[in-house]
């Protein structure tokens, strides 16, 4: 998926709250929007290089969105709206082997008490619900989710288990927005209940996928499956 807007490089200064950050752009301090409510503390450190996307809404208080940051030499996407777009592109291009037979792709569909990112159907009208989680927390090539407690994430997993029990397909895909990683695990230290729910989902035959991404300053796309350690 190519970024379809003007991308600028800046230097990160600080993040006063979840939604905003201060950066230096063209030698001036500037307030920008952060489209990610996660902590991202291991990424957004003072002095790191970040990518800004020009906003399309006129007269915005924050003219740019902070969408990615360099952690050393590695570029990590942090825009929480991007993972769904990347997965949708991968579904259309048949990059996720287990889901290649699902040609009807619908976004943001409700089942039970949850709204899921995708509802898929094949030519025989078999139905599959898919939830997407963007992953940015990485250390020594190993990635984890979540980086902050997520009651909503646990709720999604439990709903996927119920969908599976009703005879439909159900899966969760962890889109790791980094390319040089080799392992994914739930972050039990931060949110043990999420990890418990994910292990229960595996036991109940909910599909669990983890893929890394090719991330550049021009585009991001789903790359390869990553080992999952529960």
Swiss-Prot record:
Signal peptide: none annotated. GO terms for molecular function: DNA binding. Coiled coil: none annotated. InterPro entries: SfsA, SfsA_C, SfsA_N. Belongs to the SfsA family. This is Sugar fermentation stimulation protein homolog. It comes from Clostridium perfringens (strain ATCC 13124 / DSM 756 / JCM 1290 / NCIMB 6125 / NCTC 8237 / Type A). The lineage of its organism: Bacteria, Bacillati, Bacillota, Clostridia, Eubacteriales.
């Amino acid at each position: 998926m190519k970024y379809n807007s003007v991308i600028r490089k800046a230097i990160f200064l600080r993040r006063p709250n979840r939604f905003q950050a201060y950066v230096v752009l063209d030698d001036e301090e500037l307030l920008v929007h952060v489209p990610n409510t996660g902590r991202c503390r291991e990424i957004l450190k003072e002095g790191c290089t970040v990518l800004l996307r020009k906003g399309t809404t006129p007269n915005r208080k924050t003219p740019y969105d902070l969408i990615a940051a360099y952690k050393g030499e590695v570029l990590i996407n942090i825009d929480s709206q991007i993972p769904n777009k990347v997965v949708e592109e991968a579904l259309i291009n048949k990059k996720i082997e287990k889901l290649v037979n699902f040609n009807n792709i619908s976004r943001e569909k409700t089942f039970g008490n949850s709204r899921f990112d995708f509802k898929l159907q094949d030519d025989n009208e078999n139905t599959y619900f898919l939830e997407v989680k963007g992953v940015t927390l990485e250390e020594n090539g190993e990635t984890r989710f979540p980086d902050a407690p997520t009651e909503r994430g646990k709720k999604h997993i439990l709903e996927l288990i119920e969908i599976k029990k009703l005879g439909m397909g159900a899966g969760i895909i962890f889109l790791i927005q980094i390319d040089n990683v080799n392992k994914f695990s739930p972050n039990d230290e931060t949110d043990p209940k999420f990890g418990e729910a994910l292990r229960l989902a595996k036991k109940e035959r909910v599909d669990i996928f983890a893929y890394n991404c090719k991330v550049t300053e021009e585009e991001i796309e789903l790359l390869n499956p990553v080992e999952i350690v529960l």
